[in-house]
UniProtKB/Swiss-Prot annotation:
Pfam families registered for this protein in UniProt: Ribosomal_L11, Ribosomal_L11_N
Annotated SMART domains: RL11 (SM00649)
Organism: Salinibacter ruber (strain DSM 13855 / M31)
Protein name (Swiss-Prot/TrEMBL): Large ribosomal subunit protein uL11
Gene3D superfamilies referenced in this protein's UniProt entry, alphabetically: Ribosomal protein L11, C-terminal domain, Ribosomal protein L11/L12, N-terminal domain
Gene Ontology cellular-component annotations: cytosolic large ribosomal subunit
Function: Forms part of the ribosomal stalk which helps the ribosome interact with GTP-bound translation factors.
Family matches, as SUPFAM superfamilies: Ribosomal L11/L12e N-terminal domain, Ribosomal protein L11, C-terminal domain
Keyword Membrane tagged: no
Single Gene Ontology BP annotation: translation
HAMAP family found in the cross-reference section: Ribosomal_uL11
Family the entry assigns: Belongs to the universal ribosomal protein uL11 family.
Amino acid sequence: MAAPVEQTIKLQIKGGQANPAPPIGPALGQHGVNIMEFCKAFNSRTEDRMGTLLPVEITVYADRSFDFIVKSPPASVLLKQKADIETAAGDPLRDDAGTVTWDDCLDIADQKLQDLNAHTVEKGASMVAGTARSMGITVEGKPAHE
């Protein structure tokens, strides 16, 4: 029988670059998790996505063992990559940070569909387009009915 769940920890870590420094070390250390074991497991599982910010959900059990789930990168990170920008607009209503196409939004939604609260790729793309607008990124070619 598996040990009961003690805690669920949510972090955002760059793929392949987990180390015991903050924020990982303190977050795991206070629950008694072997930090180096987590870092090695995370880095080996995410070496193909080196440097990309990845949300991870760590489940800590009462016997101090753990499991973790690596999710897809945040839509904001993927939008910045597609728009080829470093940061979003400070004031999205006045400043234009960049431009993406509707097809870019569809690609991002397809990649994130399992993590989005949407049933179809088109609805997910609408959510991604909303994130883009809140970042000051213009979405070109969006269908009128969407």
